[in-house]
Amino acid sequence: MGLLGCRLRVYWLQTYWDARRGARAPHPPNERLTVTEKLKIGVLLSGSGTNLQAIIDQTANGLAVEVVKVISSRPDAYGIERARAAGIPVTSLNRAVYADPEAADAQIVTELQAAGAQYVVMAGYMRKVTPVMLNAFPNRVLNLHPALLPSFKGAHAIADAFAAGVKVTGVTVHFANEDYDKGPIVAQEPVRVAEDDTLETLETHIHQVEHELYPRVLGWIAAGRVSVDDAGHVHVAPEGGAAAQDKAASACTVGTHQGHYTLRRHVGTLR
């Protein structure tokens, strides 16, 4: 359908139509049924895929997200096995064939669009994305960085923060743009550096926060709570706020054969 948070309003006085089962059931007066389509994402990775696994695990716990494609920049990345175990289609790009970054991104865009991905989620992806991808998914390419941007950019952020002796570091989720590690920030979570922390224990703490924060942000996006203004600043509406309600109220045609919906009931006055 291409729309998120689509609402099916059912105006029967005493019954509603169960969109999943095609069966009628008692329906309290003045109640409306909301059908929310899952957010379809493509995940890019280069390594073990622990953040991919965290997302997969949270979808089993009700996160309204569907991973429709995984693309790896390395054929030996363990994240490929995680995707296959979850039944997710996987592509591994051959660096010899796609040595040119723009050619690689053009192929990635083709595969993600064919899979129906609405957002691109970088999860330990070690290649910089090009304008080819950014233009195909404007403000829809997410990146996870293991530090509080704009501090400690680059591939060794945790080690750099530890070496600098900071007392607080953290995790940032941001939209990617053409400036490396500098796109609009969606969310940040601080991590305190304890006196007895080693680099290894700090890495463990950072990764634990990553695995919680990334799915949470995806849940915000799926609920229609995230927007980017003209100045490039990200705003997250309160849960159930106006932005989320407007998104949920967007009318659409619901095809029950797709089977990718989260059902919620909202009590209110039918108009």
Model feature map: region roles:
Residues 58, 65, 73, 123-235:
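Donor/substrate-binding cores of folate-linked one-carbon enzymes
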